[in-house]
Amino acid sequence: LRFFKNLVVNSYLAGTAEPGVTEDNFAGRISAGWRDGLWDVSAFYKEVGDQFNPEVGFIKRKGIRHGYATLGAHPPVEMKWFYKLNPYSEIHYVTDLNSMMVTRTGSAALDFHLRDGGTLGVKAVSRFEKVDTPFSIGEDVTVDAGSYSFGEVIGFFRSNASLPFFTYVRFYSGTYFAGKKRTVSLNLAGRIGYRLTAQVSSNFNDIVYDNKNISANVYGIRVNYSHTTTIHSSAYVQYNSVSDEMVSNLRFNLIHSPLSDLFFVYLDRRYANSGESIDQAVVLKVTKLFNL
């Protein structure tokens, strides 16, 4: 819904049905945003029940209440190398269904919009995570249950995406739970005509935890093809060096009306060395925008 030209309100309510499940099987979200030539202000509230089970992987975390707010500005400037600044801040606040905080992420950033079409930026991030179940981040290295406060600084450069070849580079440096982490993310993309785009990505993570050095790298290849202005298909393959997992994703997208889509997705996850299948899925998703 749009009000006063610049105010946009969105919401959804979804539920799942399974034998024996009668409560906590809904998910809902409401958001509002004000966007004009200078200001960008938005917020949302989302709640996902413990028993909400869409079976399609569109929900990252269940049993939570998630609040989010951001405030940003886009003042024009007259400088030799850039024409606009974008200072902004964000906060995510996540609790369980008993309103006990489990995650908090706050950030402040400044982006420079360059005259050649690129973007340069820096961001400072502060995080809090409550870990209920220990998890592994490498061979013989485990993040124990507990509460952790940590943070990082991120710098990035994105070149002009309208060029035949363009790149996106990010650098991360900071703490990671009870350790330290540095990450370099490299993305190189190319475009052939107006239909075909291909992208190669790599993430190199150097983690120091419990006096142990861990290299956790992720590599990916993505290909997008536009058959028409309303029919698109894509393929994505990702390899994780720590888990030795290969994930493949094939997607077909039909835009059947403005902001309304039909998605057909095939997912495959398996161990790269042995080829053993972990899981597979075929997903059909239909969305429809109603103007009231």
For each predicted feature, which ranges?
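Aromatic-lined, polymer-binding surfaces characteristic
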Residues: L1
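Exposed, low-structure sequence patches enriched in small/polar residues
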Residues: F4-L7, S11-L292
